[in-house]
Design a protein with these regions (language model features):
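Cytosolic-biased juxtamembrane loops and peripheral soluble domains of multi-pass membrane proteins
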Residues: 24-44, 68-165
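Long, highly hydrophobic alpha-helical transmembrane signal-anchor segments
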Residues: 1, 42-71
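N-terminal signal-anchor/start-transfer transmembrane helix
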Residues: 12-26
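Membrane-embedded alpha-helical segments that form the functional core of polytopic membrane enzymes
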Residues: 8-13, 75-79
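Feature marks short, highly hydrophobic, charge-poor N-terminal signal-anchor/signal peptide-like helices
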Residues: 1-7
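Aromatic-acidic/polar surface patches that form glycan- and anion
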Residues: 6, 22, 47
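Alpha-helical hydrophobic membrane-insertion segments
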Residues: 9-13, 54, 149
Length: 165
């Protein structure tokens, strides 16, 4: 592997490992929440979210391999990871990639004091920023538009589950 490929390979590898680790954590947390009596909502649209994120990762991996890393966008990406850690730390065992509702009060500390859906804010930013790290502006644009459509469905479903009338 040439020296020019290493930075993009490391970045792409990080994205893939991070997403796989998140899926493992989400699976564990989901099972534990369901065992405690939680209920899943909006399961029908979950495969669409998985397909979107898998396609996004594939586009970055295939088109970004060997591309130079842009330091400005990498710095923004690193800041977004700090937000991710804050969200994960705040939600703890209640964090999942699905809409799992437990009959307990909503979390209102940490980033949830200022944002209703901080994880979606993070994902919106990350779907745009990660491709920009490798100069893939059109990937950022296309997947941001697709993500906006999917998030519209997702947020309506989550709001209906968390804030019933």
């Amino acid at each position: 592997m040439s020296e020019a490929v290493w930075p993009s390979a490391l970045f792409i590898g990080f994205l893939i490992v991070q997403r796989l680790a998140e899926l493992a954590l989400a699976r564990r947390n989901t099972a534990r929440l369901l065992a405690r009596g939680a209920v899943e909502h909006g399961a029908a649209h979950y495969p669409l979210i998985v397909a979107l994120h898998a396609s996004w990762l594939a586009a970055i991996a295939l088109l970004g391999w060997g591309e130079p890393v842009r330091p400005f966008w990498l710095a923004i990406f690193v800041l977004l990871q700090a937000l991710r850690l804050w969200i994960l730390g705040t939600l703890g065992p209640r964090w999942t990639t699905r809409i799992i509702v437990l009959d307990e009060p909503l979390v209102r500390r940490g980033p949830f004091r200022v944002l209703r859906h901080p994880n979606y804010t993070l994902v919106v930013a990350e779907i745009a920023v990660a491709p920009l790290v490798l100069g893939l502006g059109w990937v950022a644009l296309v997947f941001s538009a697709l993500n906006a459509a999917v998030l519209g469905i997702r947020i309506r479903s989550e709001n209906a589950a968390l804030y019933p009338r």
